[in-house]
C-alpha cells in the first residue's frame, strides 16, 4: 500500500538538490503501489556546515501525485538546494489513506512535535493507536493529524524525554517503542538528536535495505545482535556493535544506504540488498549497519545475508508502451517462457521445480490441497483447480484468504496449503499462512518477489519468474501463476503410467503456448475496435463454464479495476438461476465457448442469451466453424489443450479492459482507490 524510501549518504558528498532528486525518484518507483499523497523529510537550514543543518529537520508534504510534491519542493523559498552534505539522511513516503483523509497534515513523515525532533514514515496499520493516543494526550501531547502514525512519532519523543540517562541510543528508543505497538508496520525514523543516523524496523510489512559502495564491504552476512539484559542507567542493554557485528566498507570508506518497501526503488542504485525479518531493528550509525532483535526465538536465523538482486532497471521502465499494464500484457510470451525456463524438459517430458524437490514426496502423500489467495491470484487457483484435481487425484480447495480466516477453516497436518501472491506480502494471505503453520500443515509459496514474507515463511515454494509487475491490474503474473500451478500438477503425477499420455499432451501445449500468446496479441486492433463500441456502457456480463469460469471472473475483475464499469463474471450453468434476468438487447454480454467437455452446454447457454434478444460477443476457438457461423460477433483465438486454453482466452479480456480504460480517459496503471501491494487487512 504505502511506499517507504529513505536515503543515507555517508562520506559521499551530495547537494540538497541531489538528495531530493534521489528521494523523489525513489517515490516515483513506488507509485505503482498506490497512494494519494506524498512527503519528504530532510535536514533543514542553509549553513555551510552540514552538521549545523542536521540540527533542524524540514518537512515538505503534498496531497496528490509525486510530481506535485516535486513542484512543491522547488517552490520552497527558504531552502538552498546547492548546500552540500557529507553525511545526511532523507526520508520519503507515498501515503495510502487508512486513518484520516488525504491531506498534507495527514501525509508522512509524521512528526513528534512542532520542532520536528523525531519524524517517522510508516507502512501498515497500528491497531492499538487509540489507546496510545489517549495515553499520550494524558501526558500533554497535542495531536495535529488523524493518523495512527503520529502516535509513533510522539511515543518516541515521550521515551526520549523520560529516559533515565542521557546516553540512550536511537536503536534502543525504537526497540522500546515497537514493544508498545500492535498491528503491522514498516518504519524508518530520523531525529535531530541523532544526526546522520537511520533506524528502520518491520513487523508484517516489507522493508529492505540497499547498500552501495565503491569499496569492499566488511561482510556479506550481518550477525544479529540481541539485548543482553534489562536496560540499566547509563547503558542501552544491547550487545556491543563492533567490526565483527556490522556491515561497513573496509577502511571506513564512503557508503550509501537505501531503505525501501521493495526492490524496484533501489535497483537503479544498487543490486545488493538485505531483506529484514519481522521485529528486526536495523540501525545505521557512523556509516555502519547493524541489525538488532529484542528476543531470541528457536526459529531465529543467526544473521541476514547481503543478497544480489537479479533485476535490471529496464525491467521497471515502460519502454515504447503507453503504460506499464500494456507493456506487461505484451510481455506474456516472454514471461511464460521465463516461468518454464530450466524447469520443463520437452525432450523427455519431465518437470523439475527446484523449490519443491525436497518436499515433493511429502506433498504426494498428502490428503488434500488448499490454495489460498486474494484477487487475481485467487482466480489463478480457480483456473487450475480442475487440472490439479485431475492429475493429483486429490481434493483441491481454492479459498479467498479473508474468508478462509473468517471461518476458522479446519486445517490438518496432512494438508498441503499453497499461498499465491504476486508481491508475496498480501496481508490476508500472509495471515492465512501463519494460521496454517500453527496447525502443522506443509506450506508452499507461489510468489513473484524474491525475499518477500511469503517466500521466506513457507516451507518451500515456486518463484514464478514473471519479472517486475508495476501495473496495479495484474496481467503477466496471472498467466505465470497459472503455468506454475500446471507445472506443479505435472510434477505430482510424473510416476503414474495412466497419466503419461495426458502429461505429454499438456507439455506439448506448454511448448506451443508462447507462440499462441503472440497470435492472440496480434488481435489487439480488433479488440480496440470492440472497445470503441462498448466504452460508453455502464455494465458488462462475462459468461463461461468449466475451465473458463475463472477466466470470466478474472476478465470481469480487470474491467472493474481499471475502467470503473460494473462487470460480473457469471457461471453459465447458473444462468437460469437469476443472471438471465439481466439479459436484454442493451446489455453487453461476452461469452467464452471453447471446444472442450462443456461445449454443448455452453452452446445451450448461448441460445438462451440470444433468445432474450442478447447480442453476445463470443470468444471462441478459431477452428469452431459452427459458433463462428451462428454468431454475429466473435473473437477467434488459437486452439490449445483444454487446461491451458484459459490463458489464451483471458488475454483478449486483458486487452479489452486496457482499451476501455484508455477510451474512458482513466489512468490505466493507477486506478482510483486501489493499491498494487495490499499489505494491510
UniProtKB/Swiss-Prot annotation:
One annotated GO molecular function: carbohydrate derivative binding
**Could you tell me which residues carry Phosphoserine?**
103, 243
pH dependence, entry free text: Optimum pH is 7.5.
EC annotation from Swiss-Prot or TrEMBL: 2.6.1.16
**Positions of the Glutamine amidotransferase type-2 domain:** 2-287
Q: State the superkingdom.
A: Eukaryota
InterPro entries for the chain: GATase_2_dom, GFAT, GFAT_N, GlmS/AgaS_SIS, GlmS/FrlB_SIS, Ntn_hydrolases_N, SIS_dom, SIS_dom_sf
Domain SIS: residue ranges: 359-498, 530-671
Q: What class of enzyme is it?
A: transferase
Q: Which residues form a coiled coil?
A: none
**Pathway entry:** Nucleotide-sugar biosynthesis; UDP-N-acetyl-alpha-D-glucosamine biosynthesis; alpha-D-glucosamine 6-phosphate from D-fructose 6-phosphate: step 1/1
Task: Tell me what controls its activity.
Answer: Inhibited by 4,4'-dithiodipyridine.
Q: Gene3D superfamilies per the record?
A: Glucose-6-phosphate isomerase like protein, domain 1, Glutamine Phosphoribosylpyrophosphate, subunit 1, domain 1
Does DNA repair show up as a keyword for this record?
no
**Where, by residue number, does substrate bind?**
376-377, 421-423, 426, 577
Record field: catalytic activity: D-fructose 6-phosphate + L-glutamine = D-glucosamine 6-phosphate + L-glutamate
What Pfam families does the database record attribute to this sequence?
GATase_6, SIS
Q: List the disulfide bonds.
A: none
NCBIfam families, per the entry: glmS, PRK00331.1
How does this polypeptide assemble, per the annotation? Answer: Homotetramer, may also exist as homodimers.
How is this protein named in the record?
Answer: Glutamine--fructose-6-phosphate aminotransferase [isomerizing] 1
Q: Which organism is it from?
A: Rattus norvegicus (Rat)
Q: Which gene encodes it?
A: Gfpt1
